[in-house]
Amino acid sequence: MKNYIEIVDVYARQILDSRCNPTVEVEVELEDGTVGVAAVPSGASTGAFEAVELRDGDKSKYLGKGVLKAVDNVNTIIADELVGMNVLDQVAIDKTMIELDGTDNKAKLGANAMLGVSLACAKAAANSLGMSLYQYIGGVNGKVLPVPMMNIINGGKHADNNVDLQEFMIMPAGAPSFSEALRMCSEVYHALKSTLKAQGYDTGVGDEGGFAPNLKSNEEAIVVIIEAIKKAGYTPGEDIFIALDPASSEIFEDGKYNLAGEGRVLTPEEMANYYVELAEKYPIISIEDGMAEEDWDGWKILTEKIGNKVQLVGDDLFVTNTERLSKGIKLGVANSILIKLNQIGTLTETLNAIEMAERAGYTAVVSHRSGETEDTTIADLVVAVNAGQIKTGAPARSERVAKYNQLLRIEEELNDMGEYRGLKAFYNINK
């Protein structure tokens, strides 16, 4: 196997994401003519501690959301340093960009510029070696197909409705394989659409392909999903479980949680009890961002109450950042981390966060963003690191389905070597 393959060109362009906003796409060319291409996603509800996504701010073009500055940074500053480097040395590539940027949050070059380059380099390396991306990143050990965490009802910032909690999801942890899990979710999605229609609700979809009806309460979203699970012929809490992403930082005001759609304002203790009641009443296996990103006390309360039986995922809380995660581990808050590549900005730092989480007994959930592209890197990443769970939207909208289809290909390629862990993916809670 080759041990040095030179980078000969690094080039970026501005493309569109699934929300009609510009984003960065990068091509990396190698001495043997191989090319790797990667496109960068973007979030709607972003954590305050995420790495900086560089936008142009020119209101006359794309409402100020252009990324030509980030593109230029790739084509000049970053390209000048990386051309001539060994594409197989991912750590050196990412370290070089981090040093070039010189800030704590990638504000100079932009995390969107750096991530595009980081991922394009990994893809170029894999292509040059004739390997799948998951094999290149994970080696011979990358073999676990993930349980989908599939968003089928949208609220909050992902939809224009009166539902406060941002995402209501299903997890087919009782499925025997990934392909069967995907089939189950697809059938529930269709059952949910017909159930909503029958009850007179709108079946328009949100950013991530989930439906966005004007339901009477957050709890009604859970009830209608359970009805759809049963209608599809499955057993809630056995075949398929419920997962929530309240995105609580978005409803946290003056130390309290404002459930405006329900006309309720709750203290952190009351909010924790709200989740406790839901978890006792319904088969909820995972809650993401149940508390706000700076409400460490609230997180502690929630973890002490249900952290032994519900997966508590830190997204805005941890932002794929080892410093934030280390603090959470020391304080004993949450028991899982959401992994979003663009929150931190390089593949190396992403892998470091996953490794830290797993060493501490935290699960890792690899995730998309609400503004996505046809790029399928996260499908390969989740298998490479054996994370066991992926969050990438409803089985609708091609930028979401692209990830699921890539996982079907990987499952086929792994054949008997592949493993779908189902409930075993939730190894740190009592189910």
UniProtKB/Swiss-Prot annotation:
Cofactor descriptive note: Binds a second Mg(2+) ion via substrate during catalysis.
Main enzyme class: lyase
Highest rank taxon of the organism: Bacteria
Localization annotation: Cytoplasm; Secreted; Cell surface
Pathway: Carbohydrate degradation; glycolysis; pyruvate from D-glyceraldehyde 3-phosphate: step 4/5
Catalytic residues identified in the record: 208, 340
Cofactor section: Mg(2+)
CDD domains found in the cross-reference section: enolase
GO molecular function, one term: magnesium ion binding
Binding site for Mg(2+): 245, 288, 315
Family: Belongs to the enolase family.
Name of this protein: Enolase
